[in-house]
Amino acid sequence: MLQHRPLVFALAVALAVGVASPQSIAAKKHASSKSKTPAASLACTDFYAEANRSWLGANPIPKSGAVSALGQLTARAQQQQRDLLDAAMRAPQGKVQQLLGDFWASGLDEAAVEKDGAAPVAPLLQRIDAIRKTGDIAPALAALHQVGIPVAFGFNADIDLRDLDRHLGYFSQGGLGLPDPAYYTRSDADTKALVSRYADYMRKILALTGVAKKDIETQTALALDLETRIARATRPLVELRDPRNNFAPVATAGLGKQYKNLQLDAFLKAQGVSDDSVSLANPALFEQLDSLVGKLKPAQWQAYLRWRAGDAMAPYLSRPWRDAAFDFRGKVLLGQTEPAPRWQQVLDAINLAAGPMLGKEYAATYLPDASRKRAELIADQVRDALLKAIEDGPELDAAGKAEARKKLEHLRIEIGTPHRDLDFTVQPMGRG
């Protein structure tokens, strides 16, 4: 019968190890270390990557976005909008779908876009070239605002905070090509480098608009100087967090006399505004703009307007325009590595230009009454819970609770679309 002899076996193993060459032992240790180090190193240095390796491999970070639950919902909603627009393009049901379908088809026709080149922006450039004297500047500003290019300042319609059942025209700061007015006046190295790259982008756009090579530097300097003057009169972004700096109703009757060079009375008429009041929350800015219209030569305003029109239209024109815009606005400002796909750009343009129209069609298709009612029920329950918190909470005295209840009673919740109908009367645009 075979018997185990642990001691003899152990001595034999020890002897074998003892007579092995140092080189062979080192080689074995090296091979063992080489095979085990990577896994141990990854787990120790980046445990998140090691623990989530499979999920991260299956869900790579998009080149122009992020991965999140809300992002997934957004992606689904975008696909639904694409399906809706595809149907409107093939077989529109009504005038609104006809307009949306034409917009979608025209935007997706890249061959036609490339063929058109700079033709779509040509009428705007001709309008700017027609400026000869100071009195021509304000009408040119109004004309560009009419087509959605906010030069010198911003102007849009929004809810009247005094009466939520009506809309009001809002004059606001704007007209700048950089996202923060502080970029124009800061002197640190990073900001100077950014402004230098911004000026390079301006040169590209001005060249595409037809400015002669010998005039590019002069035109760029004039446009950048005017933007800097506007930026100096613009409120810092942090101040806009205060709602009182964004809403200040004024009578429209005296605006023409108060801002003679800007001709704001004629501006409002050109935008189709006939209300007796608008919001103008930064009168100092508009006083400066009015002064600049009267003080600066028309040629400087032409350079600025040509640049702003070209920049605004660049994402929708032929490839040289789009590439110039993306190189600065996509890569430099946003850190993107490649532009969004064509369908995404067209969808964004539709939402910008005709968002309420698309939204109403979307709600009619994808928001059934049962879902709307469930959402309204949840909203009502949240309101009831808030009311109970007001009543039971020790933070407010009796007067404070009464004021809170009053505000809550006036809170209106609209799910999907506004309760009142919006006017979608527009001129047909056709395709191409």
Model region roles, listed by residue range:
Residues A10-G18:
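Bacterial N-terminal signal peptides
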Residues A58-K63, P92-V96, T209-Q219, I390-R405, ...:
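Surface-exposed patches in mature extracellular/periplasmic domains of secreted proteins
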Residues A20-H30:
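Signal peptide processing junction and immediate N-terminal pro/mature segment
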Residues S41-D46, E50-A118:
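Active-site-surrounding "flap" and adjacent substrate/cofactor-binding loops of secreted or lumenal enzymes
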Residues M1-A10:
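Bacterial N-terminal signal peptides that target proteins for export
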Residues L224, D369-G432:
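Extended, non-catalytic substrate-recognition/exosite surfaces adjacent to catalytic cores, especially
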Residues A88-Q381, P418:
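Noncatalytic, helix-rich "gating/capping" subdomain that lines the substrate-entry/channel surface
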